[in-house]
Regions:
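Conserved short submotifs of the Hanks-type protein kinase catalytic core
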Residues: 139-152
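Conserved N-lobe beta3->alphaC-helix segment of eukaryotic protein kinase catalytic domains
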Residues: 100-122
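Activation segment signature within eukaryotic-like protein kinase domains
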Residues: 174-175
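Activation segment/activation loop of eukaryotic-type protein kinase catalytic domains
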Residues: 203-236
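Catalytic-loop of the protein kinase fold
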Residues: 186-203
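Short beta-strand micro-motifs within the conserved protein kinase catalytic domain, predominantly
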Residues: 129-141
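Protein kinase glycine-rich loop
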Residues: 71-78, 82
Length: 383
C-alpha cells in the first residue's frame, strides 16, 4: 500500500485522523469522567499519559515488557483499549493487536473470558486470529490478536480512501466476505451480536476480518424451535427491532440478529448515515430508536449512485419483521452478492493489489458493471 499512500498523499491524513480521535477521547470533562467509578473509565482517561500503560504493565506483569513492545494506540471501547505492538525478540517484526480489557468484578464473572474461548474455537480466513492470552492481576487481562493492517472499515473508508461512503463495487466485495464469516460462526452456533464498522477490519490483502466477540453469545444448548429472548447486547443503532422490543424468537432464526446489524452497517457505508432516520437520536434512547424503526419507511437517498439491486439486497437485511428478513442462505444467493464472484476473479487476475484497489474504488470492473445492469433489468421486470 506504500504506492497508494505516496500517490494520494495519505500519510498526513492518517496522522490528522489519529490526532482527532485521540483528542475526542482525551478531552472528556471531569463530570463525564466521574460518571462511572470503575477502573475502565479511569484507565481510558489516562491512556494518553506518557508511558502510562507500560508503567502499569511493568508493575503488574513484568514479563510483558520483556516479550512485547507497544507502538501506538488503536482504539478505545466500552471495557478497555486496543494498541498496536510487536514482539521484541523476533527478527520478523510482525505487527500485532493487543487488547486490554478491564473487569468491574475482579474477574469473578464467568462471562469475562467468553471472547477468548470463542476465538480459540473459530478458525476462518475472515475471522481474526488469537495468538495469546494472559491475566494481569485481578481486574485485567490482555490478548494478542492478528492485526488488520488498514484498520476497521470506518478508518479504511475515511483515512485510506478519504471518502465518506464506499463505492458499490468494493461494498459488494466486502459484504460477501462478511456474509461468509457470519455463515461460519452461525454454523458454530455463535451470534456475534455487535456487527458494525468498528468490528470489521481490513488486512494487508484487502480482505476483511471479523473481530471483537466480547458480547457474542452461543446457543449450542438449545433446540432450533426453542423460543428465546436473546440478550440486549451490541451497539444501539445496529440492534435489530426484536432485541430492542424484547421479543422472543425461535433459536433457528437467531442468525437474523447479525444480518440486521450487517444491513445497518452496509447502509451506513453506502449512504453515510443510518437507516430509519436514526442519526439525530441519542444512542441510549432505545425506545425512540425502536419507535423510528417501527414507524419510519426504509428510504434510500436519491443523490447516491447505488443500484436498485443493491437496495433490494439491503431491504432484505433491514426487514423489520425478522420472520420475513433474509436468512444467511438467502443473503448469499442474492444476485447482488453473487456479483462478488466477478470481483474476486478480477483480484486473482490483476498484477498487484494496488491496481485491484484502484479498480474497485472507482467502480472500474466492466464485467461487474455489466452484470449489475443486466440483473437490475431483471429486477425491474419482476417488479
Amino acid at each position: 500500500m506504500k504506492y497508494l499512500e505516496k500517490n494520494i498523499n495519505l500519510v498526513q491524513v492518517k496522522k490528522d485522523y489519529a490526532e482527532e480521535e485521540s483528542t475526542k477521547l482525551s478531552t472528556k470533562s471531569p463530570s463525564q469522567a466521574q460518571s462511572t467509578s470503575n477502573g475502565v473509565e479511569q484507565f481510558k482517561m489516562k491512556y494518553r499519559e506518557k508511558n502510562f500503560l507500560s508503567s502499569f504493565l511493568d508493575k503488574n506483569c513484568p514479563s510483558f515488557s520483556e516479550d512485547f513492545e507497544l507502538t501506538k494506540f488503536i482504539s478505545c471501547g466500552g471495557t478497555g483499549v486496543v494498541y498496536e505492538g510487536q514482539m521484541r525478540k523476533k527478527k520478523n517484526k510482525q505487527k500485532l493487536a493487543f487488547k486490554f480489557k478491564f473487569s468491574k468484578k475482579q474477574n469473578k464473572d464467568k462471562d469475562e473470558f467468553q471472547e477468548i474461548g470463542i476465538l480459540k474455537k473459530l478458525h476462518n480466513k475472515n475471522i481474526t486470529n488469537i495468538y495469546a492470552f494472559t491475566k494481569v492481576g485481578t481486574t485485567m487481562h490482555y490478548c494478542v490478536l492478528e492485526l488488520g493492517k488498514h484498520g476497521d472499515l470506518e478508518r479504511f473508508t475515511k483515512v485510506l480512501l478519504k471518502r465518506k461512503v464506499l463505492p458499490e463495487t468494493i461494498l459488494c466485495y466486502f459484504a460477501f466476505q462478511i456474509l461468509e464469516a457470519l455463515e461460519y460462526i452461525h454454523k458454530c452456533k455463535i451470534i456475534h451480536n455487535d456487527i458494525k464498522q468498528g468490528n470489521i477490519v481490513v488486512d494487508a490483502n484487502l480482505d476483511i476480518k471479523l473481530t471483537d466477540f466480547s458480547v457474542s453469545c452461543t446457543y449450542a444448548n438449545f433446540d432450533p424451535d426453542d423460543l428465546v429472548e436473546f440478550p440486549f447486547m451490541g451497539t444501539s443503532k445496529y440492534i435489530c427491532p426484536e432485541i430492542l422490543g424484547h421479543v422472543q424468537m425461535a433459536v433457528k432464526e437467531a442468525c437474523k440478529i447479525d444480518l440486521y446489524s450487517l444491513g445497518v452497517t452496509l447502509y451506513e457505508l453506502a449512504f453515510g448515515k443510518y437507516p430509519y432516520n436514526l442519526n439525530e437520536i441519542e444512542n441510549k434512547d432505545y425506545n425512540k430508536i425502536l419507535n423510528n424503526i417501527k414507524t419510519e419507511k426504509l428510504e434510500f437517498p436519491k443523490d447516491k449512485k447505488i443500484s436498485g439491486l443493491c437496495k433490494d439486497f439491503l431491504r432484505g437485511l433491514l426487514e423489520k419483521d425478522y420472520k420475513q428478513r433474509f436468512n444467511i442462505q438467502q443473503a448469499l444467493k442474492h444476485p447482488w452478492i453473487q456479483g462478488a464472484k466477478i470481483i474476486n476473479e478480477e483480484k486473482e487476475n490483476v498484477y498487484c493489489l494496488e491496481s485491484f484497489l484502484i479498480n474497485i474504488i472507482t467502480d472500474n470492473i466492466p464485467k461487474f458493471n455489466e452484470y449489475i445492469k443486466d440483473e437490475n433489468k431483471k429486477l425491474e421486470r419482476s417488479n
